[in-house]
From Swiss-Prot:
<dbReference type="GO" id="GO:0002753">
    <property type="term" value="P:cytoplasmic pattern recognition receptor signaling pathway"/>
</dbReference>
<dbReference type="GO" id="GO:0021987">
    <property type="term" value="P:cerebral cortex development"/>
</dbReference>
<dbReference type="InterPro" id="IPR000308">
    <property type="entry name" value="14-3-3"/>
</dbReference>
<dbReference type="GO" id="GO:0035591">
    <property type="term" value="F:signaling adaptor activity"/>
</dbReference>
<dbReference type="GO" id="GO:0034504">
    <property type="term" value="P:protein localization to nucleus"/>
</dbReference>
<dbReference type="GO" id="GO:0006605">
    <property type="term" value="P:protein targeting"/>
</dbReference>
<dbReference type="GO" id="GO:0046982">
    <property type="term" value="F:protein heterodimerization activity"/>
</dbReference>
<dbReference type="GO" id="GO:0140311">
    <property type="term" value="F:protein sequestering activity"/>
</dbReference>
<dbReference type="GO" id="GO:0007346">
    <property type="term" value="P:regulation of mitotic cell cycle"/>
</dbReference>
<comment type="similarity">
    <text>Belongs to the 14-3-3 family.</text>
</comment>
<keyword id="KW-0539">Nucleus</keyword>
<dbReference type="GO" id="GO:0005783">
    <property type="term" value="C:endoplasmic reticulum"/>
</dbReference>
<dbReference type="GO" id="GO:0046827">
    <property type="term" value="P:positive regulation of protein export from nucleus"/>
</dbReference>
<dbReference type="GO" id="GO:0035556">
    <property type="term" value="P:intracellular signal transduction"/>
</dbReference>
<dbReference type="Pfam" id="PF00244">
    <property type="entry name" value="14-3-3"/>
</dbReference>
<dbReference type="GO" id="GO:0030007">
    <property type="term" value="P:intracellular potassium ion homeostasis"/>
</dbReference>
<dbReference type="GO" id="GO:0005925">
    <property type="term" value="C:focal adhesion"/>
</dbReference>
Length: 255
């Protein structure tokens, strides 16, 4: 059995070398020890999976965009190749999502003892079911969306009672949960309500903000406000379709 400290160091080396698949493997072994992860370990695990999934999500969006343009042109010969390529990326996305969801359900959530870590892991569970919902269709999409909603709600229930409104993990949860309402459930009204409530609650308690989380919290508050501005203009018909995909997951790396 690998030593925990060695595995963490291997993960840090892999991160520096930008070899995120190996970073995932090291942190999966730590998670498999069924112990409460430290904040540093938790963040290493999150960053590892986020980079592995992020590259594929970006690829999927580009391929889907090319597919759409080709559909408009009516280029059937190329469409078959594009669709097969997209499906290959979707298979990779599915494997990564199912992998981390399995680690969360079997190891991380059962071993979590603090409110903070429970919120972090349930939020993560919501995020990866959301990523599945992004490309799934029919019943698969419905199931992924329902699983995501349940996980985000579980995280929210704990966050509301155990974390202050200015806590970066609580704010990050509100950010991602509101994106879920907007993008997956097509409910801009609920997305705006959630984001606005989180922003207003944090503003009201800004004086309680600890020095170490000030930068993280204010950054996420800015993102909440940016999303609100974008969504409000979209609802009024002013905004053109914009891809703000990069906004919602920024908080994971710094907590």
């Amino acid at each position: 059995m690998d030593d925990r400290e060695d595995l963490v160091y291997q993960a840090k080396l892999a991160e520096q070398a930008e070899r995120y698949d190996e970073m995932v493997e090291s942190m999966k072994k730590v998670a498999g020890m069924d112990v409460e992860l430290t904040v540093e370990e938790r963040n290493l695990l999150s960053v590892a999976y986020k980079n592995v999934i992020g590259a594929r999500r970006a690829s999927w969006r580009i391929i889907s965009s090319i597919e759409q343009k080709e559909e408009n042109k009516g280029g059937e010969d190329k469409l078959k190749m594009i669709r097969e390529y997209r499906q290959m990326v979707e298979t990779e996305l599915k494997l990564i999502c199912c992998d981390i969801l399995d680690v969360l359900d079997k190891h991380l959530i059962p071993a979590a003892n603090t409110g903070e870590s429970k919120v972090f892991y349930y939020k993560m569970k919501g995020d990866y079911h959301r990523y599945l919902a992004e490309f799934a269709t029919g019943n698969d999409r419905k199931e992924a969306a329902e699983n995501s909603l349940v996980a985000y709600k579980a995280a929210s229930d704990i966050a509301m009672t155990e974390l202050p409104p200015t806590h970066p993990i609580r704010l990050g949860l509100a950010l991602n949960f509101s994106v879920f309402y907007y993008e997956i459930l097509n409910s801009p009204d609920r997305a705006c309500r959630l984001a606005k409530a989180a922003f207003d609650d944090a503003i009201a308690e800004l004086d309680t903000l600890s020095e170490e989380s000030y930068k993280d919290s204010t950054l996420i508050m800015q993102l909440l406000r940016d999303n609100l501005t974008l969504w409000t203009s979209d609802m009024q018909g002013d905004g053109e379709e914009q891809n703000k995909e990069a906004l919602q997951d920024v908080e994971d790396e710094n907590q």
